[in-house]
C-alpha cells in the first residue's frame, strides 16, 4: 500500500495547489511496467484529443513541485500489490471529486482501466462522468484476432499454405505503422492475442545448425524478418498482447524437401526420423529465439492418420518445445494451442497432457462459416469434450466463407453467438478471423473509384468491436446494448442516435440472411462454397450429389429440413420438423427489405465517413437482391422436385418464370457489384467448387456467374421442350454409343502384372475375386494386378513414365467402410484437388 499512499499524497498536494480545469495529471510509479507506461501514454493522447492539457509524472518528490496550479484532475495508475482472488486483466476505478484512481489487477488491467475512462469520455463528449467505484474483468481468457500470412493464389511451384515471409510476397508485413494500428485496435477492443497463420514459418525465421540449407529466404530478408518479429513482439508485449504463431503439419521447407527429394507436404507420408528431427529442431530453435511467441499447432492437413497425429505431437512437437525451453534455462511451460481440425483432438490431448500441462484446445465455432447461435450435434460434442478436459478451450470464428464479401456486423447475432460459445460449447476464449478477405489481408474486396484498396481495419471496425465487446462480457442487457450500438453507429457516421438505430437495424436484419441460407441450403460451410455467388438448380434439387459435408446440417443450425426432404414429406403427407426451407427464403426476403428500408431512410442524414456509408448502403441492396434471387430459385427447385414425384409437366412449366424472375434480381446484383467489388471469394484456387470451380481465379464475380445461370435457364427450357416432344411422340431419340476410354501408352517401372479390364478379370493376386460389372467407358482399359495384403500394409504406389500427359482414374466406394481409402474432402485436405481429384469423373 506504500505506493498507493504516496500517490494519494501527491494528488492531494496537487489538488490543494490547484490547476486549470483543462489540465490533467497522470501519475504513475517510477517503477511502472511497460504496460502501465503504455496505458498512461494512451490516456494522455486521448485526453489531448478531448481538449485537455495532460501531463504524465512519476511519484518522485519532485513531482509535487511541477503541479502547482489552481484546479485540475489527477488520475493515478497503479497495479494492485495484493492480487489474491483477483481476476487477471481486471481493474477497479474509483472517483472522488477530481481524484481518479485506476488500480489494475496486473499491467494489462491498468491498460483496460484506462480504456474504460477513454470509452466513457467518448460516450460523454469528453466530460468525466465516472461512478464512485467501478470494477470489471474479462470473461474470456484469450480474446484475439488472426492475420493470415497467406495469399489468394498459390506461389509458382508451391502448394497450399506455402508462403515464405518476404517483402515480395507480403509487403504489408514489414509496415510497422500498420502493425501499430492493428495492435492498438486490439487494445481498443480489449483483445489480448494476435495469431499469425502460415503453413511453415520456421524456414523464414530460424536457422538450423544441422540443416542450414532449409532457410527459404535470403540473408537480407532473414534479417528483416528477425527485426519484424522483435518489433512485433515488443510492441505487443507492452499492450498486453500475446503473439501466437500457427503452423500446419507435416509441412517442410521447400529447399529442405528438395535437398532430400521429398514433397513439402504429403498427406499419405508416414512419419520418418528425418522429417521428425527437422521439425523438432525447427520448433526448438523458434522457442529459443522468440520466447514470447506462442505456438498454435494444426495436426493437419498433411498428416495421414489420427495415430500419426498423436505420435507427431507427443514425440516431435512437445519435445521440440521442451528443447527450446531447456536451452533458455526455463522451467515454466508457455501455452501451446492445439487445433481440433482434421484430427481427433481428444485422443491427442489424452496422450499429451501427462507430458505437457499448459495445453489449450481450439475448434471452429460453425466450421468455416457463421450460421447460427444455436449450435448442436456432433460438432458441438467435439467442443464439449474438449472444454471438459479442464484446460482453456478456444472457439475459432473461422474463415467466414458465407459472409464474403459484403459488410456484416450484427451486434445481436454476435452477442448470442458468444453466449452459445460459453453455455453450449464450454469455450472460454475467442480466436477471430477477419470478416471477409482473409486471404487478401490487409485489403477488402471493395473496388474503389480511385483504384486504391480499402483496408479491412477501417471497413470492418464493427466486426472487431462487436466480438471484442462480447468476448469481454456477453451477459449485457439487450436494451442497454441497443442504446450502446445506436450511439456507436451515430458516432461513426455523424448522425443522431435515432438514425444510428436505423444503421444498427440494417446490420442486424442483413446479418440473418447469409447464416440462414447456408444452414438450410448449403453443401458445406467450408471454403469449398462461396454462398453469395449463388447456387445452381441441381445443387438445390439434390445437394447430396455434391457431397454434403458430414455433420454440417446436424451441427450448424437448429433442427430442420433440406428442400429435398421437405418436398418428400409433402408428398408423403408426413409432419415437418423444425426450420423449413420455404420459411427461410421468405424470411430472408423480409430481412433484405427491412435492411434496405432502414439504410435508405438514414442516408440523407450521414455527415461522417460518407463514402464508406455509400458502400455500406450498396451492400444492403446487394443482400436484398441476393435474398430475392435465392427465394425465386428455391421455389423453382421446389417445382422440379414436385415433378420428380408426380411427373406432372405443369410443375416444370411453373419453374420457368420463377427462374426467369430470379435472373432479374441477379442482373441487378451484377449492376450493384460490377463497379464496387473486385471479387466475391478471396480464396481463388481449385479448392473453390460450389457453385462452380474457381480454378485460377475464375468465376469469382457475379458478372461471370450470370453467364452460367443464363445458360442454366436456357438448358432447362430446352430439356422441358425435349420432354414434351417425347410425350407427344415427336422426339426421335438416337441411341448414343458409349465409347470406351483409350488406354494410355505408358512405360511401367513398378513390376506389376497387367490384365485387360473386363467382366471376369482377376485384379488381386492374393484374393479370389473377379470383376462382376463395370461401366462401358472402362471396358478394355489396362488394369494392374495388386496384392490386397500389401495394399493394406503399405499402401499403393505405381511408378511409370509417359511421353505425354495422361489421366489416372482412382475409384472410391460410396459407403462409409474403412477398408479402402476415402474420397478426398477439401474441408480437411487442402491438397485434395491438386490433381483435379475432388470431383467425380464417372459415377
Q: Could you describe each region identified by the protein language model?
A:
Residues 159-160, 434, 453-701, 712, ...:
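C-terminal non-catalytic alpha-helical accessory regions
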Residues 4-15:
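Sec-dependent N-terminal signal peptides
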Residues 22-25, 31, 39-42, 46, ...:
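Feature activates predominantly on carbohydrate-active enzymes
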Residues 677-702, 750-754, 758-760, 818-843:
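Polybasic, proline/glycine-rich intrinsically disordered low-complexity segments
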Residues 736-792:
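Glycan-recognition and processing domains
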Residues 9, 19-97, 130, 764-770:
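Acidic, contiguous N-terminal accessory segments
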Residues 787-790, 796-807:
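Extracellular and analogous surface-interaction loops
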Residues 63, 124, 172, 192, ...:
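Catalytic-core regions of glycoside hydrolase
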Amino acid at each position: 500500500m506504500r505506493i498507493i499512499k504516496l500517490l494519494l499524497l501527491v494528488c492531494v498536494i496537487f489538488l490543494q495547489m490547484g490547476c486549470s480545469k483543462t489540465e490533467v495529471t497522470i501519475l504513475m510509479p517510477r517503477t511502472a511496467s511497460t504496460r502501465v507506461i503504455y496505458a498512461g501514454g494512451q490516456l494522455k493522447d486521448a485526453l489531448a484529443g478531448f481538449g485537455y492539457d495532460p501531463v504524465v509524472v512519476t511519484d518522485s518528490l519532485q513531482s509535487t513541485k511541477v503541479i502547482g496550479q489552481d484546479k485540475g484532475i489527477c488520475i493515478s495508475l497503479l497495479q494492485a500489490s495484493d492480487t489474491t482472488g483477483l481476476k487477471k486483466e481486471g481493474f477497479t476505478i474509483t472517483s472522488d471529486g477530481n481524484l481518479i484512481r485506476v488500480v489494475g489487477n496486473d499491467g494489462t488491467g491498468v491498460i483496460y482501466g484506462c480504456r474504460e475512462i477513454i470509452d466513457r469520455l467518448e460516450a460523454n463528449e469528453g466530460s468525466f462522468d465516472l461512478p464512485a467505484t467501478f470494477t470489471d474483468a474479462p470473461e474470456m481468457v484469450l480474446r484475439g484476432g488472426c492475420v493470415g500470412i497467406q495469399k489468394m493464389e498459390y506461389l509458382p511451384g508451391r502448394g497450399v499454405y506455402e508462403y515464405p515471409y518476404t517483402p515480395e510476397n507480403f509487403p504489408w508485413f514489414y509496415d510497422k505503422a500498420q502493425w501499430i494500428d492493428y495492435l492498438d485496435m486490439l487494445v481498443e477492443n480489449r483483445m489480448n492475442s494476435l495469431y499469425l497463420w502460415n503453413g511453415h514459418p520456421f524456414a523464414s525465421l530460424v536457422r538450423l545448425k544441422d540443416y542450414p540449407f532449409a532457410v527459404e529466404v535470403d540473408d537480407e530478408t532473414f534479417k528483416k524478418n528477425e527485426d519484424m518479429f522483435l518489433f512485433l513482439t515488443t510492441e505487443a508485449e507492452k499492450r498486453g498482447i500475446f503473439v501466437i504463431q500457427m503452423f500446419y503439419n507435416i509441412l517442410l521447407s521447400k529447399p529442405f524437401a528438395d535437398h532430400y527429394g521429398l514433397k513439402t507436404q504429403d498427406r499419405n507420408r508416414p512419419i520418418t526420423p528425418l522429417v521428425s528431427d527437422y521439425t523438432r529442431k525447427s520448433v526448438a530453435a523458434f522457442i529459443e529465439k522468440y520466447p514470447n511467441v506462442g505456438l498454435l499447432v494444426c495436426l493437419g492437413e498433411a498428416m495421414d492418420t489420427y495415430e500419426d497425429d498423436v505420435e507427431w505431437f507427443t514425440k516431435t512437437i512437445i519435445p521440440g518445445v521442451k528443447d527450446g525451453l531447456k536451452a533458455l534455462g526455463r522451467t515454466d511451460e508457455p501455452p501451446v494451442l492445439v487445433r481440433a481440425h482434421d484430427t481427433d483432438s481428444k485422443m491427442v490431448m489424452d496422450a499429451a497432457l501427462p507430458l505437457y500441462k499448459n495445453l489449450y484446445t481450439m475448434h471452429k465455432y460453425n466450421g468455416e462459416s457463421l450460421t447460427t447461435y444455436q449450435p448442436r450435434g456432433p460438432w458441438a460434442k467435439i467442443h464439449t469434450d474438449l472444454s471438459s478436459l479442464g484446460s482453456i478451450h478456444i472457439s475459432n470464428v473461422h474463415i467466414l466463407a458465407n459472409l464474403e464479401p459484403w459488410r456484416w456486423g450484427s451486434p445481436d447475432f454476435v452477442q448470442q453467438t458468444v453466449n452459445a460459445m460459453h453455455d453450449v460449447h464450454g469455450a472460454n476464449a475467442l480466436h477471430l478471423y477477419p470478416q471477409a478477405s482473409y486471404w487478401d489481408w490487409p485489403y477488402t474486396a471493395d473496388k474503389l473509384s480511385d483504384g486504391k484498396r480499402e483496408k479491412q481495419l477501417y471497413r470492418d471496425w464493427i466486426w472487431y468491436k462487436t466480438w471484442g465487446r462480447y468476448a469481454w462480457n456477453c451477459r449485457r442487457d439487450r436494451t442497454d446494448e441497443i442504446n450502446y450500438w445506436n450511439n456507436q453507429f451515430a458516432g461513426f457516421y455523424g448522425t443522431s442516435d435515432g438514425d444510428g438505430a436505423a444503421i444498427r437495424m440494417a446490420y442486424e436484419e442483413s446479418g440473418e440472411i447469409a447464416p440462414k441460407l447456408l444452414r438450410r441450403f448449403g453443401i458445406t460451410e467450408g471454403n469449398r462454397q462461396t454462398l453469395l455467388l449463388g447456387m445452381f438448380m441441381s445443387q438445390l434439387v439434390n445437394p447430396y450429389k455434391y457431397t454434403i459435408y458430414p455433420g454440417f446440417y446436424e451441427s450448424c443450425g437448429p433442427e430442420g429440413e433440406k428442400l429435398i426432404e421437405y418436398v418428400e414429406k409433402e408428398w408423403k403427407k408426413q409432419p415437418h420438423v423444425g426450420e423449413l426451407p420455404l420459411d427461410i427464403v421468405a424470411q430472408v426476403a423480409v430481412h433484405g427489405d427491412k435492411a434496405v428500408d432502414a439504410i435508405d431512410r438514414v442516408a440523407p442524414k450521414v455527415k461522417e465517413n460518407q463514402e464508406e456509408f455509400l458502400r455500406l448502403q450498396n451492400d444492403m441492396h446487394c443482400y436484398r437482391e441476393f435474398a430475392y434471387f435465392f427465394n425465386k430459385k428455391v421455389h423453382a427447385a421446389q417445382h422440379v422436385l414436385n415433378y420428380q414425384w408426380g411427373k406432372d409437366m405443369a410443375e416444370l412449366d411453373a419453374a420457368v418464370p420463377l427462374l426467369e424472375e430470379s435472373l432479374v434480381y441477379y442482373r441487378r446484383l451484377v449492376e450493384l457489384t460490377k463497379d464496387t467489388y473486385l471479387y466475391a471469394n478471396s480464396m481463388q484456387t481449385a479448392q473453390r467448387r460450389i457453385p462452380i470451380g474457381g480454378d485460377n481465379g475464375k468465376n469469382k464475380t457475379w458478372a461471370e456467374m450470370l453467364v452460367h445461370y443464363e445458360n442454366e435457364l436456357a438448358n432447362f427450357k430446352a430439356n422441358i421442350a425435349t420432354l414434351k416432344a417425347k410425350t407427344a411422340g415427336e422426339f426421335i431419340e438416337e441411341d448414343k454409343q458409349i465409347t470406351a476410354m483409350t488406354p494410355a501408352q505408358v512405360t511401367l517401372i513398378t513390376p506389376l502384372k497387367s490384365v485387360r479390364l473386363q467382366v471376369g478379370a482377376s485384379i488381386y493376386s492374393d484374393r479370389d475375386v473377379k470383376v462382376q460389372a463395370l461401366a462401358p467407358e472402362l471396358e478394355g482399359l489396362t488394369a494392374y494386378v495388386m496384392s490386397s495384403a500389401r495394399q493394406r500394409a503399405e499402401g499403393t504406389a505405381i511408378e511409370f513414365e509417359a511421353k505425354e500427359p495422361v489421366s489416372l482414374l482412382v475409384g472410391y466406394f460410396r459407403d462409409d467402410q474403412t477398408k479402402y481409402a476415402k474420397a478426398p474432402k477439401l474441408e480437411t485436405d487442402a491438397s485434395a484437388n491438386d490433381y483435379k481429384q475432388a470431383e467425380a469423373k464417372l459415377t
